[in-house]
C-alpha cells in the first residue's frame, strides 16, 4: 500500500503555465476543473492515524497560477456542500454521476449554457452491485457495493454516436454513449464511455453547431452525458493515451476536466499541448 503523497506545487504551477500558453496560442474560451478526491471530505471516517492529503490548498494555488481570462470551476466548494449525498463511489476511485452532475451545473454555466435541472432527469440504476478496485483489493463485504446510474432527460431525449479511435488508429463506432458490456467486467465504471482511448468523438442530435474539446482523464467520463445535452459535437482527448489534438478549427471551446492529481502530470500536458 503506497502512502498518499502531497501534490507537487511545482508540477501544478508548470501545468498551469502550459495551459496558459495554450490559451494564448488558441485564444479560445477555456474552462479548467480540478476534481478533488473523496479523502478531502471523509477523512473523519478514516482509522486513527491513517494519512491523507488535503487537496484544497493545492487546488487554490493551481487556480491562482492560471490566467485570469481562463474560467475555473470550484469543484471543491460544490462537492463539500454536497458531501452528505452519494457523490463518490465507495469501491471505485471516482466520483458518482450525482457528484459529476453537481459540478456540471457550474461548468456548463461557465461555458455559456443554462444547466438542465435535476427534476428533468429520470435516474436508473443499471447496476446496483458494482464493486470496484477497493473491493478487488480487499475482497471484503463490509463495504456496500456501488450504484452505476444513467440520467435520462425526459423533456429532450439525447441520441448519440460515439466514434472511438484506438491506439493502432483503427476506429469503432457505437450508437450510444454507454458501453453496456462493461457492466459485466471488473471495471463497470467503464460503462460510461468504454475503455480509455486516445480520441472519442461524440456526435449528438443537438443541432446547434456547438463543438467542445474536452481534455480529460477517466474521472471525466460520467460527466460527459450531461455535457452532451448542450453540444452537437464533443471531442474527448484522454491525457493518458493521446499526444495529438484535433485541428483547432474543429472546436470552439475547451474544457480541462481531470482529477487534481492528474494536473501534476506536467509531461503529459506538455506532450499534448506544446507539440
Task: List where the protein language model places each region.
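Extracellular glycan-modifying ectodomains
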Residues: 1-275
